[in-house]
């Protein structure tokens, strides 16, 4: 599925705030007439978008996949779209069976009313070559305590980053990152830290010291949510 996260508090259901998960669940239940537990591959944060989110729900009822998808898209708001639906194995779990999650972050280097909603307008230059060199410090299995919120409920802060790279193309700078899992606010904090290191002419040791500190206050300021997309989930 795809969604524009601008008007939502994120994927996960919360009280007194619109969530992607709740919005889709409500529409499924209208069509199906039964209660469902919609499980997403991951919890995108408030304001974060998705190009390839995956979710599943279980039912004992017979469903015509084509008609169900068409009906669901017809009543979903315009900022949420179901791209594909298929029957999965009974034991499939979109969250726990996901091997890797991939995110992209978009920077625009010129002001455009058409890019503002889905990219971070950043007027200063970004040296992708130097940023890619700094990215090497994030690769592998590490403790990302310094790159997530202090009051997060997640006890295990170990994540394995397989790939992280920057690329410039047609007025946009794209950051791509792939890992087995991500913590709350982790991607945006990593990006903010990389930019901080670039602006202050820091080397890899700067990044290593942040990891060692295991304290969010040592990392850079998180970049805005509007440029971040859940790009793909790999199974």
PLM segments and residue spans:
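Structured-RNA-binding interfaces characteristic of tRNA pseudouridine synthases
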Residues: 1-235
């Amino acid at each position: 599925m795809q969604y524009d996260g601008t008007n939502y508090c994120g994927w996960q259901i919360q009280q007194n705030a619109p969530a992607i998960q709740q919005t889709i669940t409500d529409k499924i239940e209208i069509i199906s007439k039964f209660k469902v537990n919609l499980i997403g591959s991951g919890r995108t944060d408030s304001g974060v978008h998705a190009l390839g989110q995956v979710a599943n729900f279980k039912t004992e009822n017979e469903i015509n996949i084509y008609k169900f998808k068409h009906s669901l898209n017809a009543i979903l708001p315009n900022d949420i779209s179901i791209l594909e639906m298929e029957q999965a194995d009974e034991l499939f779990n979109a969250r726990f069976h996901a091997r890797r999650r991939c995110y992209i972050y978009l920077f625009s280097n010129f002001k455009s009313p058409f890019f503002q909603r889905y990219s971070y307008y950043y007027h200063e230059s970004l040296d992708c070559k130097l940023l890619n060199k700094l990215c090497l410090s994030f690769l592998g299995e590490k403790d990302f305590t310094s790159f997530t919120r202090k009051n997060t409920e997640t006890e295990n802060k170990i994540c394995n980053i397989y790939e992280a790279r920057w690329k410039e193309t047609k007025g946009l700078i794209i950051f791509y990152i792939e890992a087995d899992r991500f913590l709350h606010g982790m991607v945006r904090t990593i990006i903010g830290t990389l930019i901080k290191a670039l602006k202050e002419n820091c080397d890899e040791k700067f990044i290593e010291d942040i990891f060692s500190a295991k304290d969010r206050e040592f990392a850079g300021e998180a970049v805005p949510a509007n440029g971040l997309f859940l790009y793909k989930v790999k199974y």
